[in-house]
Design a protein with these regions (language model features):
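Conserved active-site neighborhood of the chymotrypsin/trypsin-like protease fold
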Residues: 55-57, 66-144, 159-162, 220, ...
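Flexible, gly/ser-rich surface segments that form the specificity/activation loops bordering the active-site cleft
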Residues: 25-29, 33, 76, 116-163, ...
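N-terminal activation segment of mature serine protease catalytic domains
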Residues: 19-63, 70, 82, 249, ...
Length: 346
C-alpha cells in the first residue's frame, strides 16, 4: 500500500462585488455561496462506476466539461473492464477516452448523454486562502455533497500548480470538481496524505485543458500508475515533507527540505519547511533567515506570518504580535482566530 492513501473521491483574481447572477468574490472573507448557486454546479456532476476482472467495483465522481465529456481521476477507471456514468438513475457508457495516467486525469467521451457542462477556469492565478467549493458524490450517496474550504498551498509541478486545500475528501469522491467562487472549475480532487491531519491534494484544471488536445485511446487500455503512487523517494517533495512535519521528525524534515531547495532554490514551500525544521532544531537565527526569504517572495504567506508571530510572542515583542494579528486578519478572519488560539498557553 502506498503511504499516500488513495481516496475514492474525487484558485483567480479577486472580484470586487458579488453579482446578481450568483458570482461571488474570491477574497478570503467572501460570503458563502447561495443554495441556488450550488444547485447549478451540482447539475454537472455524475457518479462514475467501474468494474474489474475479479468482479470488484469502483466508484468515483465526475464532472461534465462539455455535453459529451466527463473528467475524473484515472485511478477510478484503472484496470477496469467496464465503466459508466450515471445521472439521476440513468446510466451511460463511454465510447472513447483520453488519459493522462501520470497526472491521474482521464476524460471520457459519450454519445447522447447531453450533459450540462461547467465553465473551466484558470489554475495559474490562484492565491493562498482563496475560498473554494468542492462537490462530490461520496460512497453510496444519491445526492452531491458540498464542502467549502480554502486553498492552503500551491505547489509548482510539471508546468502547473498542484493545489492543497482544506476541503476534505470522502470515500467515493475521487474525481470531484473544485470550483472558485465564480463557479469556474479550477481543479480535480484526487488524493490525501495519511493520518488524522491529512493534506488534501487537487490536480489543476490546466492539465485537463492540455489533455483535451491529446488523441483519444481505446477504452480499457492498460493503465499506468500516477506520480503520487511512486516509491517515497520518487514522489514530489511537497508530498515527502508531510509525514516528518506532522510527526515532529525535524532532522528528517530538514534533510528533505534541503534536497527540495537544491532542486528548487526559490521554492516558497521548501523555504518554509526548512525554516520550520531549523526552528524546531533550535537554530533560531537560521530559521528566521529562511522565514524572511519566504516573505520576500510571498509577503502574505500565512504559515510564515503565524510562525514569526509566535516567535515574537515568545520574545515578549507585543508590537510584532499586534502586527501579526493585523496581517492575518487582512487575509482571513479565520487565520487570526487560529493565531489567537495558538497564543494561548498550552
Amino acid at each position: 500500500m502506498p503511504k499516500f492513501l488513495l481516496m475514492s473521491l474525487l484558485l483567480a483574481s479577486l472580484t470586487a462585488h458579488a453579482q446578481d447572477t450568483g458570482v461571488f468574490p474570491n477574497s478570503s472573507n467572501a460570503a458563502a455561496p447561495s443554495e441556488d448557486f450550488l444547485y447549478q454546479l451540482k447539475e454537472s456532476l455524475v457518479k462514475v462506476s467501474s468494474t474489474v476482472k475479479n468482479g470488484g467495483h469502483g466508484y468515483g465522481t465526475g464532472v461534465a466539461i462539455s455535453k459529451d465529456h466527463v473528467v475524473t481521476n484515472c485511478h477510478v477507471l484503472q484496470d477496469s473492464n467496464g465503466m459508466s456514468i450515471s445521472k439521476w438513475g440513468v446510466a451511460f457508457a463511454p465510447v472513447a477516452m483520453i488519459a493522462d495516467w501520470e497526472h491521474d486525469i482521464c476524460i471520457m467521451r459519450f454519445e447522447w448523454a447531453d450533459l450540462k457542462p461547467v465553465q473551466m477556469g484558470d489554475s495559474e492565478n490562484l492565491h493562498y486562502e482563496q475560498p473554494i467549493v468542492s462537490i462530490s458524490m461520496p460512497g453510496d450517496s444519491p445526492a452531491p455533497y458540498v464542502t467549502l474550504g480554502k486553498i492552503k498551498a500551491l505547489y509548482p509541478f510539471d508546468g502547473a500548480n498542484v493545489m492543497r486545500a482544506s476541503a476534505a475528501f470522502a470515500i467515493g469522491a475521487s474525481g470531484s470538481p473544485v470550483f472558485d467562487y465564480n463557479g469556474k472549475l479550477i481543479a480535480i480532487s484526487t488524493l490525501k496524505s495519511p493520518g488524522q491531519k491529512a493534506y488534501f491534494y487537487n490536480m489543476p484544471i490546466k492539465w485537463v485543458k492540455e489533455l483535451l488536445t491529446k488523441p483519444e485511446i481505446p477504452l480499457y487500455q492498460a493503465s499506468k500508475s500516477p506520480f503520487w503512487d511512486a516509491p517515497d523517494e520518487a514522489r514530489p517533495f511537497f508530498m515527502r515533507v508531510v509525514l516528518p512535519y506532522q510527526n515532529g521528525q525535524w532532522a528528517e524534515l530538514k534533510t528533505v527540505a534541503q534536497a527540495w531547495l537544491k532542486q528548487e532554490p526559490t521554492s516558497t514551500e521548501a523555504l518554509y519547511y526548512m525554516a520550520t525544521a531549523e526552528q524546531n532544531l533550535g537554530n533560531a537565527k537560521l530559521a528566521n533567515q529562511y522565514y524572511q526569504q519566504v516573505l520576500k517572495q510571498h509577503p502574505n504567506h500565512p504559515a510564515t506570518l503565524m510562525a514569526l508571530g509566535l516567535l515574537a510572542n515568545k520574545a515578549g515583542n507585543v508590537a510584532e504580535v499586534e502586527k501579526t494579528h493585523l496581517a492575518l486578519k487582512a487575509i482571513d478572519d479565520a487565520l487570526d482566530e487560529e493565531f489567537i488560539e495558538a497564543l494561548k498557553p498550552q
